[in-house]
Amino acid sequence: LRKIFKHIKSYGGAVLIFDYGPFKKKLISTVQALYRFKKCSIFDHPFESDITYHVDFNNIKKISKEYKLKYLGPITQKQFLFFYGINERIYNLSLKTKSKKKMENLYSQFKRLTDPNGMGDLFKCIFISRNRLELPAFSKNYKWTYNIINNFITASWREILHIIKKII
C-alpha cells in the first residue's frame, strides 16, 4: 500500500479500492475462512478453504494522509454500483436475454453484488488520489441526499429483482 501511495504522490494517478470490512469500528481479529462460499473454522478444510480478513479502512485513510493524498469515501459497493448505473445495465441485459438460465444467472449475480444484507453493504469503496477530484458518487452534495438516494437504491433493487423474478 505504501508503495502504491508513494507512486501516486510522485507521479499522480489514483486508486479505487473495493474491499470488505467495517469503517467505523476498530478492528481486532477478523480472520475467517470460507469453504464453498460459506464461513467455516480456519482449521476446517485445510488447503481447500480461503482464509481472509476484514480490511482496516481507517488505517488506509491514515496512511494516505501520511502521503498527503486526497481520500474520498467510504461508500458502500451498492451505492457505487447504483450511482454508476448497474440498474440500467441489468435492465438492458435482461431485455436482450432470452434464456431462462441466463436470466437466473443475471439475477443471482445482481443480487450477490447489490444485496444490502450481503456484498452490497459489506463491501466498501474508497478513492485515493494526489489531486482533489470531484467524483459524483463521493461528493458532499451526494452525502446530504444519502437517505433519499439510499431509499431509491433499495426501492430500485427490489424493483429490479421483482422484474427479473417475473421473467424467470
PLM features per residue range, with description:
Residues 1-168:
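Long, Lys/Arg- and hydrophobic-enriched amphipathic alpha-helices
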